[in-house]
């Protein structure tokens, strides 16, 4: 994600001075670096000037009390001003459960509108909503074929026509059909154009009047940078745009300019597109976004993703964990959960101390491929092996089992043994967790759990981690700090409290 370059430059401007006496001269140098990074990201020069002025006005070295961290105060001030830069200050629309919510997509051709329609349908579908798609784009050749292909891949019901050429008729028929079938989120894709023109706006108005959408989403290409502002204003003047999705933020240096420009029009950005794949779209919330940008993590978002998995509903697994039991089948299910959580980069960026580009796209694909390979090996195991209380011991006593699994999965015995070694490490950690009283009670884990036992668990986790990852987190102290934050977040989340 190229936006991470901006985050890295701002973080670099703030970090090196931690061992330096921070005075007026150092502050000016820091602000210069930060403003240069923002200008390089195509943020409007007036907005950058205002940010610099506000940060400078918020810091008074003479009035600072003794013992206060000047670097922390500057970092907080920069964080707050970046939030102001990206926050339009308008409430975001949310669909209503048990009701047909009609969402109409508008935008220029080539902005990624049709793909984004499917991404949004898939996003709500994963959260338990009954979603569908309507293709009212009759202008672009192949538009219905593209939507049909995307919807089929995402397993989302769709409606369109190869013969009807009136987009208003298609939109009306599709929405009525899906309302009769009690669909909760009905997404209508409309025609785009190569440029803003009256015929486009006229068609959008006709479709809008016919289907009476609850939310009109404007899809915008993030690669045009601050030029997004005039485009967003033009669409807002013609139709009642309530939300914006900015796409293509994974491969262009102008992403910062695009986001700040949209915010300047007071249009709330609800999602950002970070890649071509169906799950490469993230909900946009200003504070968590800036926090991730600066490597400060987003534990609220991480806990939300974990909560979506509904792990607490798996009473059998929770009971096993309490007693320190962990089978190969349990590990397989956890691998499935990891796949459900979405791209690794999104998860990594939510952990404090990690930047969103910690793992490159190539490494991410490689990691997902490795995970799928491990699951393929486990698919070749029988029920007795998957459910054995100590699967690794069973395989070590009978080496022929590993050879059979390798043949069945098209892998080598060495790879099967590596899988079993990973399972042994996981199992050892679970046994330690099972021996810690109060770990599964919920609430304030700091009060429930013996500190020395928690320290041993942290050491066990550190042994399992890639040294590069542990170093990025700030060593053992960084891991312990992250665990404390995670525990505090867990105690405040539904489904993580004791019954």
UniProtKB/Swiss-Prot annotation:
Gene Ontology MF, one: ATP hydrolysis activity
Alphabetical UniProt keywords: Cytoplasm, Endoplasmic reticulum, GTP-binding, Hydrolase, Nucleotide-binding, Nucleus, Ribonucleoprotein, RNA-binding, Signal recognition particle
Region (M-domain): 295-499
Disulphide bonds in the chain: none
Pfam family, one: SRP_SPB
Chain segments carrying region NG-domain: 1-294
Subcellular compartments: Nucleus speckle; Cytoplasm; Endoplasmic reticulum
The keyword Ion transport is annotated on this UniProt entry: no
Binding site for GTP: 107-114, 189-193, 247-250
GO biological process: SRP-dependent cotranslational protein targeting to membrane, translocation
GO cellular component: cytosol; endoplasmic reticulum; nuclear speck; signal recognition particle, endoplasmic reticulum targeting
EC number in record: 3.6.5.4
Reaction equation(s) it catalyzes: GTP + H2O = GDP + phosphate + H(+)
Top-rank taxon, per record: Eukaryota
Statement: the UniProt record of this protein carries the keyword GTP-binding: yes
Enzyme class at the top of the EC tree: hydrolase
Primary residence: nucleus
Family membership noted in the UniProt record: Belongs to the GTP-binding SRP family. SRP54 subfamily.
PANTHER family (UniProt xref): SIGNAL RECOGNITION PARTICLE 54K PROTEIN SRP54, SIGNAL RECOGNITION PARTICLE SUBUNIT SRP54
Assembly behavior: Component of a signal recognition particle (SRP) complex that consists of a 7SL RNA molecule of 300 nucleotides and six protein subunits: SRP72, SRP68, SRP54, SRP19, SRP14 and SRP9.
UniProt comment concerning the protein's domains: The NG domain, also named G domain, is a special guanosine triphosphatase (GTPase) domain, which binds GTP and forms a guanosine 5'-triphosphate (GTP)-dependent complex with a homologous NG domain in the SRP receptor subunit SRPRA. The two NG domains undergo cooperative rearrangements upon their assembly, which culminate in the reciprocal activation of the GTPase activity of one another. SRP receptor compaction upon binding with cargo-loaded SRP and GTPase rearrangement drive SRP-mediated cotranslational protein translocation into the ER.
Protein name: Signal recognition particle subunit SRP54
Gene (name only): SRP54
């Amino acid at each position: 994600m190229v936006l991470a370059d901006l985050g890295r430059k701002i973080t670099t401007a703030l970090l090196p001075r931690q061992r330096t006496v921070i005075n007026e001269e150092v502050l000016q140098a820091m602000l210069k670096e930060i403003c240069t990074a923002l200008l390089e990201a195509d943020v409007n020069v007036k907005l950058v000037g205002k940010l610099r002025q506000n940060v400078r006005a918020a810091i008074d070295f003479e009035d600072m009390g003794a013992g206060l961290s000047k670097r922390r105060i500057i970092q907080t001030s920069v964080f707050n001003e970046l939030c102001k830069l990206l926050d339009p200050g308008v409430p975001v629309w949310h669909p209503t459960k048990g009701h047909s919510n009609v969402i109409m997509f508008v935008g220029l051709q080539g902005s990624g509108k049709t793909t984004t329609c499917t991404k949004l349908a898939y996003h709500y579908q994963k959260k338990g909503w009954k979603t569908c798609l309507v293709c009212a784009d009759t202008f672009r050749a192949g538009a219905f074929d593209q939507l049909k292909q995307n919807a089929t891949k995402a397993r989302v019901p769709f409606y369109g026509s190869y013969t009807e050429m009136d987009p208003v008729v298609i939109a009306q028929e599709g929405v009525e059909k899906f309302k009769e079938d009690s669909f909760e989120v009905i997404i209508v894709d409309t025609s785009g154009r190569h440029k803003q023109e009256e015929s486009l706006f006229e068609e959008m108005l006709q479709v809008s009047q016919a289907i009476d959408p609850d939310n009109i989403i404007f899809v915008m290409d993030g690669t045009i940078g601050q030029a997004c502002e005039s485009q967003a204003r033009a669409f807002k003047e013609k139709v009642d745009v309530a939300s914006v999705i900015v796409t293509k933020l994974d491969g262009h240096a102008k992403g910062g300019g695009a986001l700040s420009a949209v915010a300047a029009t007071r249009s709330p950005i609800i999602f950002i597109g970070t890649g071509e794949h169906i799950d490469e779209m993230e909900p946009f919330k200003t504070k968590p976004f800036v926090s991730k940008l600066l490597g400060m993590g987003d534990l609220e978002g991480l806990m939300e993703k974990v909560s979506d998995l509904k792990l607490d509903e798996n009473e059998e697994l929770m009971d096993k964990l309490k007693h320190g039991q962990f089978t190969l089948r349990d590990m397989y299910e956890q691998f499935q959960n990891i796949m459900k959580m979405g791209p690794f980069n999104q998860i990594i960026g939510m952990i404090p101390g990690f930047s969103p580009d910690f793992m490159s796209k190539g490494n991410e694909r490689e990691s997902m491929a490795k995970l799928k390979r491990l699951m393929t090996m486990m698919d070749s195991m029988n029920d007795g092996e998957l459910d054995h209380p100590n699967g690794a011991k069973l395989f070590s006593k009978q080496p022929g089992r590993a050879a059979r699994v390798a043949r069945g999965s098209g892998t080598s015995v060495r790879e099967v043994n590596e899988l079993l070694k990973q399972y042994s490490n996981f199992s050892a950690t679970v046994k330690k967790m099972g021996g810690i009283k109060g770990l599964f009670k919920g609430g304030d884990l700091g009060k429930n759990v013996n500190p020395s036992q928690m320290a041993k668990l942290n050491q066990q986790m550190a042994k399992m981690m890639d040294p590069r990852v542990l170093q990025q987190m700030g060593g053992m102290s960084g891991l312990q700090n992250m665990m404390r934050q995670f525990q505090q977040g867990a105690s405040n989340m539904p489904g993580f409290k004791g019954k």
